[in-house]
């Protein structure tokens, strides 16, 4: 509340925030989220924004229009839809529900809902772990395979780590920068909504190491230019709240909140399993992924829940 009090007085009022983020929050993130886990990420490689959804949607603007994207299937819609809006995805096949210039990487029960390396080489690879919507994760060894692949092919990985606070298994990495070589191929996006409940407050970060290029272009400086051109910075009050997340009290409260959501997921998962459904997830993410019964499509099951079960 100290930041609110500061903003209430002319002598301590803060105007436009630094467009790339206040140093106090960038340093807190670098220290706690990365350096504490052995990741070589510095404060000036972290860009503060007002929501991971915005960052996931806006990051494609610094890439060429003819860049080809690869996405998991199923996928968080923002990755595809913003590229559609940018004119990058080709023509739409309504019957198949796919775009001609998008590489789809199936995530099925047979692959433990994790993607396999695509046969066609993409320019941009969207990965989200723990995954929205399936709740699946990959081990550090599996993620290293993707980093090696991206460095070999020249692709850039957009790594959505919004749900990293829910990871409970030691073999599951909290950041792609735990993998060797990730600084030269990966951009990571973090959210304060999923761990700290900033849903109506809005705060996020995009991490772009100074080593990463697309072709001959340094993406760190390009994103800094784009960010400064289109964004006037997240408010001082919100960024001070973000800094408080890394205090001892903040960490304790976050741990309790994550445990609450994971217990909800446990109750849902166990209830569905007891009812005879095949389900996964709920271990490193608050998502439960359910196999629809009797050959129903996802939309049929959704309508059934809405109209018959009142869910």
Model-derived regions, located:
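A short helix->loop->beta-strand "cap" motif at the edges of active sites that frequently abuts
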Residues: 67, 152-155, 183-184
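Conserved beta-loop-alpha segment that forms the PLP phosphate-binding cup at the N-terminus of a helix
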Residues: 22-25, 42-67, 199-204
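Conserved glycine-rich beta-strand-loop-beta hairpin in the small C-terminal domain of fold type I
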Residues: 243, 258-269, 278-292, 298
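Active-site phosphate-binding strand-loop segment of PLP-dependent enzymes
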Residues: 93-174
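N-terminal small-domain helix-loop-helix segment of the aminotransferase-like
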Residues: 1-51, 245-249, 266
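Conserved core segment of the aminotransferase class I/II
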Residues: 84, 178-259, 266-270
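Conserved PLP-anchoring active-site segment centered on the Schiff-base-forming lysine
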Residues: 62-83
């Amino acid at each position: 509340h100290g930041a609110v009090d500061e903003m209430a007085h002319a002598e301590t009022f803060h105007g436009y925030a630094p467009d790339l983020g206040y140093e106090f929050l960038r340093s807190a993130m670098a220290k706690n989220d990365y350096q504490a886990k052995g990741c070589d990420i510095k404060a000036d490689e972290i860009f503060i924004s007002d929501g991971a959804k915005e960052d996931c949607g806006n990051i494609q603007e610094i890439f060429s229009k003819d860049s080809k994207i690869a996405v998991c299937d199923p996928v968080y819609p923002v990755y595809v839809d913003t590229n559609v809006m940018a004119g990058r995805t080709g023509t739409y096949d309504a019957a198949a529900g796919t775009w001609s210039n998008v590489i789809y990487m199936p995530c099925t029960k047979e692959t433990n809902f994790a993607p396999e390396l695509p046969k066609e080489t993409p320019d941009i690879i969207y990965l989200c772990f723990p995954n929205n919507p399936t709740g699946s994760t990959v081990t550090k060894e599996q993620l290293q395979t993707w980093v090696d692949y991206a460095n070999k092919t020249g692709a850039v990985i957009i790594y959505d780590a919004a749900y990293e606070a829910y990871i409970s298994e030691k073999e599951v990495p909290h950041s792609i920068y735990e993998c060797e070589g990730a600084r030269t191929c990966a951009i990571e996006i973090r959210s304060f909504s999923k761990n700290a409940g900033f849903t109506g407050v809005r705060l996020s970060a995009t991490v772009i190491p100074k080593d990463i290029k697309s072709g001959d272009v340094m993406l760190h400086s390009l994103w800094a230019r784009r960010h400064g051109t289109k964004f006037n910075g997240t408010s001082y009050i919100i960024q001070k709240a973000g800094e408080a997340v890394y205090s001892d009290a903040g960490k304790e409260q976050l741990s309790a909140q994550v445990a609450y959501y994971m217990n909800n997921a446990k109750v849902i998962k166990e209830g569905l399993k007891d009812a005879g459904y095949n389900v996964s997830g709920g271990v490193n993410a608050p998502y439960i992924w359910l196999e629809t019964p009797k050959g129903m499509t996802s939309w049929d099951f959704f309508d059934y829940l809405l109209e018959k079960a009142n869910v």
